[in-house]
Amino acid sequence: MGSGQWHVEKRSTFRNDSFVREYGIVPETGCLSIIVLGASGDLAKKKTFPALFNLYRQGFLNPDEVHIFGYARTKISDEELRDRIRGYLVDEKNAEQAEALSKFLQLIKYVSGPYDAEEGFQRLDKAISEHEISKNSTEGSSRRLFYLALPPSVYPSVCKMIKTCCMNKSDLGGWTRIVVEKPFGKDLESAEQLSSQIGELFDESQIYRIDHYLGKELVQNMLVLRFANRFFLPLWNRDNIENVQIVFREDFGTEGRGGYFDEYGIIRDIIQNHLLQVLCLVAMEKPISLKPEHIRDEKVKVLQSVVPISDDEVVLGQYEGYRDDDTVPNDSNTPTFATTILRIHNERWEGVPFILKAGKALNSRKAEIRIQFKDVPGDIFRCQKQGRNEFVIRLQPSEAMYMKLTVKQPGLDMNTVQSELDLSYGQRYQGVAIPEAYERLILDTIKGDQQHFVRRDELKVAWEIFTPLLHRIDKGEVKSIPYKPGSRGPKEADQLLEKAGYLQTHGYIWIPPTL
């Protein structure tokens, strides 16, 4: 945009308080017990506890109501758990944060025990009940939120123990909810088996299948962008859009997680869940309301419209050196890179390729959505070689969105040049802290809002799309192509994009605006 001074406007915001009333998402009071199962693991330390601390600092967790319980097999004390997570929460040199941290850590109690025996969960229930008795009076309810920061293999036994020993028993009302992390199975059969095992114990309204991509700021912005802006409505279809890319790139490899990653691969790890969820929001029809079930109904409909994936529209890759990890088999075919084209058979999207691309050890780190529009018919300026209009939504890092367009280059001649209209969140929303995805989603579970969580039928259809391809990969029928770390990935992937109709703008680089 130029190098001059930026003027940051102050604009009014509209807070839709009627939303919570209309859709039954109402604030609750009373004792809130948050139980982090797998409390000594990396996920809990790096994501769950930091999200809880940030919610506490912002006033969303009332210290007069909430208590946090860690549960794991590791035999440690309350203070040892606090010491383990302390360094992941704040820089203690900040006096204000250090004071908040000290108060937050005092809310945490630890219980150790196995995941498949009642004895440990009975002690956990006793600790929770003591907290509830100390906090509750004649008013209020008892709410229990179980966050399973655990591998899916132990979900069935843990859920059975929760159901047997740890359900909310208050006569004053309240609820018991569970949060489960991906991966939800490895294919359709295992996902359905897992869903059945959990579904026999809990109602769907109690189950929150978390996909942290649905908590990202610009992913949550998709419905607002699409359905609250008039100029997008007539353009968002096959008559105007040439192709859609949803991209996830990392500039590092598996880094010590090779054995775990090799069981799943990049499609199970990223594409079948994160990128497919983004596709739903880009491609779905307008829901009749913002009720969570209405939104999730439309996501299921668009997934049901995806046609089977053709091997001709898939490129797999594996970066050189991946098998050097001692935990990875020498003959592994597991892809660390994949580009696959999905096609949606409906009136809006017939003929438009949705290109889902993800990879590790590439030349950059970013996640973005690229909506590329069709060429202008009757190009009187002869500028099509400069590139098409493209609407780009940068999910990470440095959240932003920009529209690539052709304009007249300043000067006496009639020359055209590619430029952009852009919105960089760091520049536009200075001083506004953008919440982490886990903060939003944990708060949603407390509120009882399932809009940003995956429903069972949605999960089933997602696996139906990818399971046939995954089984062919597992059998070695689709091979991974070697690529150099730090590259764009296999050259065959670029050839597939070109075949699908994607036109790259050579020489154009978007530069985020600076103050």
UniProtKB/Swiss-Prot annotation:
Residues the entry annotates as binding D-glucose 6-phosphate: 182, 212-216, 250, 269, 360, 365, 396
What tissue specificity does the UniProt entry give?
A: Expressed in roots, leaves, stems, buds, flowers and siliques.
Per its record, the protein catalyses:
D-glucose 6-phosphate + NADP(+) = 6-phospho-D-glucono-1,5-lactone + NADPH + H(+)
Regulation (activators, inhibitors) = Regulated by metabolites.
What the entry lists under Gene3D superfamilies is as follows: Dihydrodipicolinate Reductase, domain 2 (3.30.360.10), NAD(P)-binding Rossmann-like Domain (3.40.50.720)
Q: Which pathway features in its UniProt record?
A: Carbohydrate degradation; pentose phosphate pathway; D-ribulose 5-phosphate from D-glucose 6-phosphate (oxidative stage): step 1/3
Q: Entry's PROSITE patterns?
A: G6P_DEHYDROGENASE
Please describe the relationship between pH and activity.
Answer: Optimum pH is 8.0.
Q: What Gene Ontology cellular component terms go with this record?
A: cytosol
Residues binding NADP(+) 1, per UniProt: 38-45, 73, 155, 182
Q: Which NCBIfam families match?
A: zwf
* Summary of the function given for this chain in its UniProt record: Catalyzes the rate-limiting step of the oxidative pentose-phosphate pathway, which represents a route for the dissimilation of carbohydrates besides glycolysis. The main function of this enzyme is to provide reducing power (NADPH) and pentose phosphates for fatty acid and nucleic acid synthesis which are involved in membrane synthesis and cell division.
Give the note: There are 6 glucose-6-phosphate 1-dehydrogenase genes in A.thaliana.
What this protein is called in its record is: Glucose-6-phosphate 1-dehydrogenase 6, cytoplasmic
